Curated annotation (Swiss-Prot):
Domain of life (superkingdom): Bacteria
Protein's job: Catalyzes the reversible transfer of the terminal phosphate group between ATP and AMP. Plays an important role in cellular energy homeostasis and in adenine nucleotide metabolism.
Its EC number(s): 2.7.4.3
PANTHER family named in the record: NUCLEOTIDE KINASE
Residue numbers spanned by region NMP: 30-59
Residues reported in the UniProt entry to bind ATP: G10, T11, G12, K13, G14, T15, R123, I132, Y133, L200
Pfam families (alphabetical): ADK, ADK_lid
Organism for this UniProt entry: Buchnera aphidicola subsp. Acyrthosiphon pisum (strain APS)
The protein's name: Adenylate kinase
Taxonomic placement: Bacteria, Pseudomonadati, Pseudomonadota, Gammaproteobacteria, Enterobacterales
Subcellular location: Cytoplasm
Amino acid sequence: MRIILLGAPGTGKGTQGKFITEKYKIPQISTGDMLRESVVLKNKIGMIIKNIIEEGKLVSDEIVCHLIKNRIKKHDCINGFILDGFPRTIQQALYLSKKNIKIDYVLEFIIPHEYILERISGRRIHIQSGRIYHVKFKPPKIKDKDDLTGQTLITRKDDTKEGIKKRLEEYKKVHDPLVQYYIHEKKRGNIKFFQIDAMLSFSSIRKKLETILKK
């Protein structure tokens, strides 16, 4: 089962991806996590990525495709994987096709952009595990502490109002053409494409996902 998750920052696709991972035992490959891990390594490519992210721009297709190609070769992807945050552009989608990387499902999470600012600015992250909380919608049991480890939660540097607006502007430029590409692929019978209302409750979305992934 090979799945692509689409959706603007703050739609909750990462959280739902974790649910799919736990239920179907396939890894969730987050390009955001991969990019941040590269930055932490402080190697040549990591420093390039760091500068791009701090400017609020999107990392080039060449860099992201290189990271994805190496990741899906690993043994834990033998039964499938979830791509979270990839592809972001038509070029990245065509890269998958060119490399004969078969995708079964494309799931797009939809939410009005006016709600995204509130969702993202309230996010708190457990950096070691990737667990995501929200001060309003999904608060930790103890303020600013991870439920399982008790370690301190952080706010991403680019989760400021200015950073969020920049990311949404960049996202809009490439999102619509990408969705149209996958709608076309659905009509050709190459993939199964579904749009999901991300304003629904977590449990409602999960039930919907279970129904979709049985098809």
